[in-house]
């Protein structure tokens, strides 16, 4: 869970024995993404693993790692990817993001990866997807449907934050 001291909800307790290395690495990447986006003027970070997310976005099938509103007003679902999932899993996640976009819940889904290799692999996997569901109808996964998906490495995001660029 990505938290800051002034967050309204703060975890009640911590059990070190239940924290796995992989989970720690994922949460640290989430922290870096949140900090980089907030340095660019983003605000209102909401963790996807909190009850507040479920209350604010009922019916969303896939919960992203976080939601943030950028300084231009765009609402972005943040997905941090340390390793690749199956193609079928990404299709389900894409369908959920498209449905959330159609419902006006967020405008973009930003995938942030630790390195160029993972970024390139994910872009190639997305390129291999030809059909997705939009409004319960199979549609081509063309430029129009792909434009809401952004791909960045954490270094790209942090460098953009440091330079004030997008």
Question: Model features per residue range: what roles?
Answer:
Residues 1-6, 47-49, 150-153:
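Helix N-cap / beta->alpha transition motif
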Residues 1-29:
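Interdomain/boundary linker segments immediately adjacent to catalytic/signaling cores
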Residues 2, 9-13, 67, 75-77, ...:
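Ordered hydrophobic segments in well-structured contexts
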Residues 21-24, 34-76, 84-89:
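Active-site metal-binding core of divalent-cation-utilizing nuclease and nuclease-like domains
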Residues 28-31, 91-97:
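Well-ordered, non-membrane alpha-helical segments in soluble/globular domains
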Residues 33-41, 97-101, 126-130:
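Hydrophobic, Leu/Ile/Phe/Ala-enriched alpha-helical segments that form helix-helix packing faces
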Residues 84, 88-92, 101-108, 113-166:
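Non-catalytic C-terminal interaction segments of nucleic acid-processing enzymes
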């Amino acid at each position: 869970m990505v938290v800051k001291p002034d967050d309204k909800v703060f975890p009640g307790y911590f059990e070190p024995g239940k924290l796995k290395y992989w989970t720690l690495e994922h949460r640290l990447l989430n922290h870096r993404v949140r900090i980089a986006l907030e340095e660019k003027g983003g605000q209102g970070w909401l963790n996807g693993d909190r009850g507040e997310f479920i209350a604010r976005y009922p019916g969303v099938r896939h919960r992203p790692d976080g939601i943030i509103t950028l300084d231009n007003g765009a609402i972005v679902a943040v997905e941090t990817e340390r390793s690749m999932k199956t193609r079928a899993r990404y299709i389900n996640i894409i369908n959920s993001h498209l449905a959330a976009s159609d419902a006006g819940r967020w405008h973009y889904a930003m995938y942030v990866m630790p390195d160029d290799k993972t970024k390139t692999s994910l872009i190639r996997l997305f390129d291999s997807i030809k059909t997705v569901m939009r409004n319960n109808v199979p549609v081509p996964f063309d430029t129009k449907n792909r434009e809401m998906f952004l791909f960045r490495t954490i270094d790209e995001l942090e460098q953009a934050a440091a330079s004030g660029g997008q």
